[in-house]
Structure formats: C-alpha cells, structure tokens
Design a protein with these regions (language model features):
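Alpha-helical junction/boundary sensor with strong preference for TPR arrays
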Residues: 11-14, 54, 88, 122
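Terminal, low-structured helical/coil segments at or just beyond the last alpha-helical repeat
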Residues: 2, 13, 17, 113, ...
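Alpha-solenoid helical repeat scaffolds
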Residues: 5-8, 48, 82, 116
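TPR-adjacent "capping" and linker segments in tetratricopeptide-repeat scaffold/adaptor proteins
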Residues: 9-26
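Alpha-helical adaptor scaffolds
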Residues: 21-93
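Register position in tetratricopeptide repeats
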Residues: 36, 70, 104, 134-141
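Ankyrin-repeat and related helical/solenoid repeat scaffolds used for protein-protein interactions
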Residues: 85-116
C-alpha cells in the first residue's frame, strides 16, 4: 500500500518542476477536492483546462475520466481512459476504471480483461479479484 501511495503521489505531481508544472499540480489537487465534494461540473472544467494546457499529462485525463464515470457518461469516460493508457499503459487506476466502465456498459468480458491487466501490474490489489469473480457470476446468470 505504501508503494501505491507513492505511485499516486508521483502521478498527481506534474512532471516538470517549473512554474507551469506547479500551477497544474495545484489545479489537479483543486479538481480532486471538487470531486470529493461531488462538484463534478467544476471538477470537469478544471481537468479539461489542465488537459488543454498539457495533453501529455495522463493523470489529468484519468481524473477527468473518473468525473465522467461519476456523471454516468461512460462512453466519454472510456475515451479519456484510452488516452490515459496510450500515455501510460501501466496505469492500474485507469485500467480499474475501464473495468468499471465496461461493467456499466454490460461488456463483462472486456471488464474482466481490464481487471486481469490490473492483476498483472499490481498482483496484491484485491479489488480486481473480487470484480472478476462477480463478473463471472453475472455472465453465468446471463447464460441460464
């Protein structure tokens, strides 16, 4: 868990150590606070602003994907997740989010594949194991 926290801290800090990087890091933190407060429209605007300023910062895409998921805009969330994974293919948070999105879209096999990728990257994470088991039960229930 300590390593996971360090990874999230790294991902949530803009990779440049200049004024722009500090400003974008602060904006990401502000957007994350808005998400916690369920002020999703404002958070969406902030993450979009960060993406415009630096489209290569995958964590801004990931945060916006989370907001879109929370808004029930699953297809748009998936598009942002695709961008995250294009920029950082080992982003276990985005892969987990993809599993959630695909579950909502009832694409259970795709969701399972996403969670299997998470397991390869982060074997000690428990949520993917639980979700895979749950999804397999859903698939079984559909075939009856």
């Amino acid at each position: 868990m300590k390593i996971e926290k360090k990874i999230w801290k790294i991902w949530s800090t803009h990779p440049t150590n200049d004024r722009k990087g500090y400003r974008l890091t602060e904006l990401l933190a502000k957007g994350s606070l808005l998400v916690a407060r369920k002020e999703l429209n404002r958070a969406y605007e902030i993450f979009s602003q960060i993406i415009l300023a630096d489209p290569s910062w995958f964590e801004a895409w990931n945060k916006r994907a989370t907001v879109l998921y929370m808004m029930g805009k699953y297809e748009y969330s998936q598009k942002d997740i695709n961008q995250v994974l294009k920029l950082e293919k080992r982003h276990f948070g985005a892969l987990s989010g993809q599993g959630l999105v695909q579950t909502e879209l009832k694409n259970y096999e795709k969701a399972i594949n996403s969670y299997k990728k998470v397991q390869k990257i982060y074997p000690s994470m428990q949520a993917p194991k639980v979700m895979i088991s749950h999804l397999k039960e859903l698939i079984k229930g559909q075939s009856i």
